[in-house]
């Protein structure tokens, strides 16, 4: 077997018959498989041991040679080589065909490669191949020309003979008629009898003339056909072809079936054909030029690759190894076999029958029919169902052909090469493990024992519990007590990986240190749930064991849960307290008044009656007061604190030099808040406020912001420890808080009826206007009722909110952000409001009752529509989202950080600061742009950034940290030019500077990071949260696609529904009203020709524009585009989305990049999902990587082909250097599916979609896969060239330090090492920069 690490590229080409014979170990001659009595393979059959190798290791078929000592001997009795039975997985056979057959991929694929090569229409080709027509393969023009006069004379002579025969026949018949008439007259027959005889004779003579004319016409047709006969001419009429063969067979050759095609291919001159086609392309136009271009692609492919086109017609076919198409015996003595065996059997049967017929000299028609059947059986073997009805097996099931084995989710690529199952893995249900640390998981004892079995057995032998491995194995299987102690040792510091399907992003698989637990369920840390999207309602997780030291190191350093706190999509923390923990922390940090429970002992200033209350000298004293029951947890008190850092404002005021541990300050706080701050690192500024997960507001602190801040300023280990403390405190105080939900906590609004009566009256008025007065259209009635009842729901909801006291558990849960939202409380206690029907339109009767009161039957029925639609949508969305992720991964999988800096000066401009104006419109300061988090953060400056005075604030190439961005905002810098993957000049992949920082680590991205995969996961993972809805815009503009379908539409670069045309020039608008349409004319500002847009739909509506108010020119208003308005280049003229192809044409590459980023982000932001722009930019870079060649210049490119822009750049540079003409290209935007299939790697494209088409194309072009991306390396089993598998890390050998060497080579009885140091290099233990240490 070839070792995958010893080759760098993989090439695919066309196999000739000689190649197939060379691979083969023998010819399969019989259709038999195995003997059903002896169960041994039949000789020369499909499982023959002589051809494919022995079925048992080191044993020949007849049993003469057994054991390994006869290795390599070929038995003289049975002819079987003594070797391992594994060779039956790799040895091939072949079938010698009695007649050639065409390969269905090349004849039936779209486009038909055979058809393009030979310039034959696929229909004609099919007629020839399946023996329905003859084709002329060659004509001897010289001989024909030389003998033409003689042949013509012969033909004219034959014509004269025919005419002479006709004349004599007619004369004979006329003479006979005379006799007959004479006889009749003599007999005294009547006139009508004579006429009858006369007519019959005339009719006969007419027939004779017609027959002769037909004969002459046929002779003329045969002669004309012969004179004009040319190669590749098809003759459908069998009789004409036979006549031609009879008369002129010396002057031409022809035939039918694959044999004729083979002859044509052998006579085909690639070079002269390519020359002719290039001539047509240069001088021709229209359809002719297009056809020539398409044909040249195929001809040039054969020319360039050196493939022999004759490989498309097969003289022999390969038989794949028998272990890959096995036959197994079932219980009842029957056999289950792979479909391939049936298909091979059909081929062999028909082939043998054809051989026999040819030997017997059967009539041609029978032989041709048998040849056609052989062709069909080979077609079915290669690709069943591609042509005609598929061959079916038992139960009318189409048999799986060789093509079907590769295709689809169950095919070889996706099932066995990209998705292997692995050993050392298990799965079980998960339960919560609140006692665990963030980097730990609970592993059931039995599962751990099975997973770590080899490690345990090794240790048992090492520790002398067992004499050998066999007895150690027995001990493990019997679960002896000592095994458990050894297991504890084996699992310590050996991380395991947990995975929850679906693994939508890289945090769906993380490493943990196992802790042994009783029971059979895996225990998961509560904070890890968010990343896995796990809950404990029966979810299962898989456990995988990293075996090698390198794998363990990677799991511990890169994948440990405590090192993966931040989301790779947005850089926000994913491991955050949720649910109970949030409730607990909210309860702990609340503040209450003296008269509320938990508020006793609050601060009261000193009065004449007594000293101040609620003042404590230390945190310890406050704790003591609580233990005595005089101080509530949430009471506001004053405490002297010296062990925690003061809040920022107090520190600035009281400790201008900076605060040191031990410096005393006075906190105005609650005991609970001190307890919370105790959880944070001691030098983190004190937080005074109530902790919430979402919602924010005055006096509230977002937990996410705190963790973000911690992650940015402290090492990961500190962050992980802090979060564990938060988790413990959250659970502890959630338990103590007694927050529960019961029916009595749901308070019902007393005055709901009054509110609803008011709205009911309004609704009646609207209904009356529609039904009785006809003053409203159906649409207006609908819109008004929807609006009315939405207002009603809001009013009832807001009233309900005011009804609840702060200490009611329901608002506590909602306000803390632990679960639910206010809308759900409205539904529980107020009213459900409007619901949708199954089409997604609102039902105009609202649900007026709350769930607490209970719904009426009609309300329940109305509500069930929407609920079911919701569930159906969710299911569809999950599937669609998964497919989108798969396409995104495929298009971006080879985008890896390849180098540190590509050295480009280019970049994109992103907004930073926005002016803050007062009522008069004066600028009072600056604030950060709303999109700063997802556009500027984590980038590298492309050029120097200067403030208003011209001082350089940021140097080119400097990272834009949060601190720098704050400084830029303060200085009022409105936009900066940053490096972006869109402008990166690295040919394959991207450079670290253009990518910026990795969102998951907060540091500049490492070389080798698979940023393309991260980008695809970051976009695909939130896909399930996006809606499936199509929004209805009240009558105008039709439906607006939103949510997931919109994202797909953008990434596939489809023309959107109701697309809006865009202005190609800047100028003034002139509108003409033409019934249902507008005609819009733009008068350009530069005075060039006017641009006219016709047939603009009124129904779609004109676009909205922002214009200054007449009364207050400082303010802007939105209104519909009108006569005399000014439009800029790229402005939309109608409502609806713009077509990306139009945007590319009008605004160029940068314009379409910006358009796509903005549009995709709009969809995600609408759902509250934060994704950094750089992820979307990576996908867009892949969509815009190629261009169409318009003029090829002096390059090798063909006009009309898609080429990689970096490839074209290199080719143009070479052409210019040699004094030639560069190629002209037009930028193209390709959808992600098309871009994936156009990738350089044929392995990656074939495993994605349209497997057979990709492989057909790759084989003709003899494509070579350079194994640059991840997918192709996974398929062939190499380490992926990303992360730690990148080449610069591959050749590193680790050298021990002095201390380590002494420890390794010391002998206990002697003090010193007996090895001298001169045998070693200098090991100082210092790390060596990789690039200097090795020439990489």
Swiss-Prot record:
InterPro entries tied to this protein: DNA-dir_RpoC_beta_prime (IPR045867), DNA-dir_RpoC_beta_prime_bact (IPR012754), RNA_pol_asu (IPR000722), RNA_pol_N (IPR006592), RNA_pol_Rpb1_1 (IPR007080), RNA_pol_Rpb1_3 (IPR007066), RNA_pol_Rpb1_3_sf (IPR042102), RNA_pol_Rpb1_4 (IPR007083)
Biological role stated in the UniProt entry: DNA-dependent RNA polymerase catalyzes the transcription of DNA into RNA using the four ribonucleoside triphosphates as substrates.
SUPFAM superfamilies associated with the record: beta and beta-prime subunits of DNA dependent RNA-polymerase (SSF64484)
Quaternary structure, from the entry: The RNAP catalytic core consists of 2 alpha, 1 beta, 1 beta' and 1 omega subunit. When a sigma factor is associated with the core the holoenzyme is formed, which can initiate transcription.
Domain of life the protein comes from: Bacteria
Keyword Magnesium: yes
HAMAP family reported in the protein's UniProt record: RNApol_bact_RpoC
Annotated binding of Zn(2+) 2, by residue: 902, 984, 991, 994
Protein family (similarity comment): Belongs to the RNA polymerase beta' chain family.
Keyword Transferase belongs to the record: yes
Entry's Gene Ontology molecular function annotations: DNA binding; DNA-directed RNA polymerase activity; magnesium ion binding; zinc ion binding
Major enzyme class: transferase
Pfam family, one: RNA_pol_Rpb1_4
Single biological process term from Gene Ontology: DNA-templated transcription
Name of the featured protein: DNA-directed RNA polymerase subunit beta'
Binding site for Zn(2+) 1: 60, 62, 75, 78
Keywords: DNA-directed RNA polymerase, Magnesium, Metal-binding, Nucleotidyltransferase, Transcription, Transferase, Zinc
Positions annotated to bind Mg(2+): 535, 537, 539
GO cellular component: DNA-directed RNA polymerase complex
Note accompanying the cofactor annotation: Binds 1 Mg(2+) ion per subunit. Binds 2 Zn(2+) ions per subunit.
Disulfide bonds: none
Cofactor annotation: Mg(2+); Zn(2+)
EC number: 2.7.7.6
Catalyzed reactions: RNA(n) + a ribonucleoside 5'-triphosphate = RNA(n+1) + diphosphate
């Amino acid at each position: 077997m070839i070792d995958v690490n010893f080759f760098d590229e993989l090439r695919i080409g066309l196999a000739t018959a000689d190649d197939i014979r060379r691979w083969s170990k023998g010819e399969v001659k019989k259709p038999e498989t195995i003997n059903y009595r002896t169960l041994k393979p039949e000789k020369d059959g499909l499982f023959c041991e002589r051809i494919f190798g022995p079925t048992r290791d080191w044993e020949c078929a007849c049993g003469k040679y057994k054991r390994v000592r006869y290795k390599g001997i070929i038995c003289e009795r049975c002819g079987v080589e003594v070797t391992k039975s594994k060779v039956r997985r790799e040895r091939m056979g072949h079938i010698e065909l009695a007649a050639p057959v065409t390969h269905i991929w090349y004849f039936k694929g779209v486009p038909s490669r055979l058809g393009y090569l030979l310039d034959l229409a696929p229909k004609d080709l099919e007629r020839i191949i399946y023996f329905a027509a003859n084709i002329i393969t060659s004509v001897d023009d010289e001989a024909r020309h030389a003998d033409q006069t003689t042949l013509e004379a012969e033909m004219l002579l034959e014509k004269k003979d025919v005419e002479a025969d006709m004349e004599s026949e007619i004369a004979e018949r006329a003479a006979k008629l005379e006799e007959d008439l004479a006889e009749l007259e003599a007999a005294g027959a009547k006139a009508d009898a004579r006429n009858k005889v006369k007519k019959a004779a005339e009719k006969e003579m007419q027939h004779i003339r017609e027959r002769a004319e037909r004969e002459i016409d046929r002779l003329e047709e045969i002669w004309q056909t012969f004179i004009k006969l040319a190669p590749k001419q098809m003759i459908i009429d069998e009789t004409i072809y036979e006549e031609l063969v009879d008369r002129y067979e010396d002057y031409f050759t022809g035939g039918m079936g694959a044999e004729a095609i083979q002859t044509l291919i052998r006579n085909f001159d690639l070079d002269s054909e390519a020359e002719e086609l290039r001539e047509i392309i240069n001088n021709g136009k229209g359809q002719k030029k297009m056809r020539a271009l398409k044909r040249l692609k195929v001809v040039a492919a054969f020319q360039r690759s050196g493939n022999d086109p004759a490989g498309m017609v097969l003289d022999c076919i390969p038989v794949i190894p028998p272990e890959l198409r096995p036959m197994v015996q079932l219980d009842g003595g029957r056999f289950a076999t792979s479909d391939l065996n049936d298909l091979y059997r059909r081929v062999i049967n028909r082939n043998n029958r054809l051989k026999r017929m040819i030997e017997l000299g059967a009539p041609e028609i029978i032989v041709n029919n048998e040849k056609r059947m052989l062709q069909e059986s080979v077609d079915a073997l290669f690709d069943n169902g591609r042509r005609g009805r598929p061959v079916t097996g038992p139960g009318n099931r189409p048999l799986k052909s060789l093509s079907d084995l590769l295709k689809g989710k169950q095919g070889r690529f996706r099932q066995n090469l990209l998705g292997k199952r692995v050993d050392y893995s298990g799965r079980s249900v998960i339960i919560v493990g609140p006692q665990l640390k963030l980097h730990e998981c609970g592993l059931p004892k039995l599962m751990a024992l099975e997973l770590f079995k080899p490690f345990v057995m090794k240790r048992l032998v090492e520790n002398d519990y067992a004499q050998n491995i066999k007895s150690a194995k027995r001990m493990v299987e019997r679960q002896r007590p000592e095994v458990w102690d050894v297991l504890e040792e084996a699992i310590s510091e050996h991380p395991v990986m947990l995975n929850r399907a679906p693994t939508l992003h890289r945090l769906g698989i993380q490493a943990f240190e196992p802790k042994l637990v009783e029971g059979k369920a895996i225990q998961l840390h509560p904070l890890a749930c968010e990343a896995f999207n796990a809950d404990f309602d029966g979810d299962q997780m898989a456990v995988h064991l990293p075996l090698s030291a390198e794998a363990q190191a990677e799991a511990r350093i890169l994948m440990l849960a405590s090192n993966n706190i931040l989301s790779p999509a947005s850089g926000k923390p994913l491991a955050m307290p949720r649910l109970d923990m949030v409730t607990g922390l909210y309860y702990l940090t609340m503040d209450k008044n003296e008269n509320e429970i938990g508020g006793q002992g609050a601060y009261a200033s000193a009065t004449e009656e007594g000293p101040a209350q609620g003042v404590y000298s230390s945190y310890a004293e406050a704790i003591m007061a609580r233990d005595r029951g005089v101080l509530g947890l949430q009471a506001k008190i004053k405490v002297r604190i010296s062990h925690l850092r003061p809040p920022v404002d107090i520190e600035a005021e009281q400790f201008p030099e900076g605060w040191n541990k031990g410096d005393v300050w006075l906190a105005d706080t609650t005991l609970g808040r001190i307890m919370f701050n105790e959880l944070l690192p001691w030098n983190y500024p004190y937080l005074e406020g109530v902790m919430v997960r979402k919602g924010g507001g005055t006096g509230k602190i977002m937990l996410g912001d705190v963790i973000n801040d911690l992650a940015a300023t402290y090492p990961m280990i500190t962050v992980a420890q802090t979060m564990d403390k938060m988790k413990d405190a959250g659970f502890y105080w959630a338990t103590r808080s007694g927050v529960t939900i019961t029916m009595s906590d749901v308070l019902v609004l007393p005055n709901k009826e009054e509110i609803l009566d008011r709205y009911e009256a309004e609704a009646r008025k609207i209904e009356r206007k529609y039904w009785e007065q006809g003053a409203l259209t159906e649409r207006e009635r609908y819109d008004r009722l929807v609006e009315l009842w939405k207002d009603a729901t809001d009013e009832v909801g807001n009233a309900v909110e005011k009804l609840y006291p702060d200490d009611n558990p329901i608002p506590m849960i909602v306000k803390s952000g632990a679960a639910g939202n206010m809308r759900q409380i409205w539904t529980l206690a107020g009213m459900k409001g409007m619901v949708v029907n199954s089409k997604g339109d609102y039902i105009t009767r609202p649900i007026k009752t709350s769930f607490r009161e209970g719904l009426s039957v009609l309300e329940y029925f109305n509500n069930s529509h929407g609920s079911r639609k919701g569930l159906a949508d969710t299911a569809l969305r999950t599937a669609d989202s998964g497919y989108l992720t798969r396409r995104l991964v495929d298009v971006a999988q080879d985008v890896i950080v390849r180098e540190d800096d590509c050295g480009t000066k280019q970049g994109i401009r992103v907004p930073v600061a926005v002016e803050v104006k007062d009522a008069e419109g004066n600028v009072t300061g600056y604030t950060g742009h709303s999109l700063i988090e997802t556009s500027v953060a984590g980038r590298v400056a492309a050029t120097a950034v200067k403030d208003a005075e011209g001082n350089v604030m940021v140097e080119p190439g400097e990272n834009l940290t949060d601190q720098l961005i704050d400084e830029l905002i303060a200085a009022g810098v409105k936009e900066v030019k940053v490096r972006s993957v869109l402008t990166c000049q690295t040919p394959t992949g991207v450079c670290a500077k253009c990518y910026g920082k990795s969102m998951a680590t907060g540091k500049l991205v490492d070389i080798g990071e698979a940023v393309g995969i991260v980008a695809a996961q970051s976009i695909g993972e939130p896909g399930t949260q996006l809606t499936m809805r199509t929004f209805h815009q009240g009558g105008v503009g039709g439906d607006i696609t939103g949510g997931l379908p919109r994202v797909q539409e953008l990434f596939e670069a489809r023309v959107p529904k109701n697309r809006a045309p865009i202005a190609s020039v800047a100028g003034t608008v002139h509108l003409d009203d033409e019934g249902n349409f507008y005609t819009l004319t733009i008068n350009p500002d530069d005075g060039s020709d006017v641009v006219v847009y016709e047939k603009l739909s009124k129904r779609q509506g004109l676009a909205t524009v922002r214009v200054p108010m007449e009364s207050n020119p400082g303010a802007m208003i939105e209104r519909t585009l009108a006569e005399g308005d000014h439009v800029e280049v790229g402005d939309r003229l109608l409502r609806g989305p713009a077509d990306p192809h139009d945007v590319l044409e009008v605004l160029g590459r940068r314009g379409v990049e910006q358009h796509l980023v903005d549009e995709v982000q709009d969809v995600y932001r609408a759902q509250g999902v934060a994704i950094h722009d750089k992820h979307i930019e990576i996908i867009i870079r892949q969509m815009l990587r190629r261009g169409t060649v318009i003029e090829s210049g002096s390059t090798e490119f063909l006009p009309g082909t898609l080429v990689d822009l970096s490839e074209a750049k290199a080719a143009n540079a070479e052409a210019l250097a040699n004094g030639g003409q560069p190629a002209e290209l037009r930028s193209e935007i390709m959808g992600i599916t098309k871009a994936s299939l156009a990738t350089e790697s044929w392995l990656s494209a074939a495993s994605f979609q349209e497997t057979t088409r990709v492989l057909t194309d790759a084989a003709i072009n003899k494509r070579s896969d350079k194994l640059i991306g991840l997918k192709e390396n996974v398929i062939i089993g190499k380490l992926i060239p990303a992360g730690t598998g990148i080449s610069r890390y591959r050749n590193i050998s680790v050298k021990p330090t002095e201390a380590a060497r002494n420890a390794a080579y010391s002998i206990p009885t002697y003090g010193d090492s007996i090895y001298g140091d001169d045998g070693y290099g200098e090991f100082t233990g210092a790390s060596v920069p990789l690039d200097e240490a090795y020439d990489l």
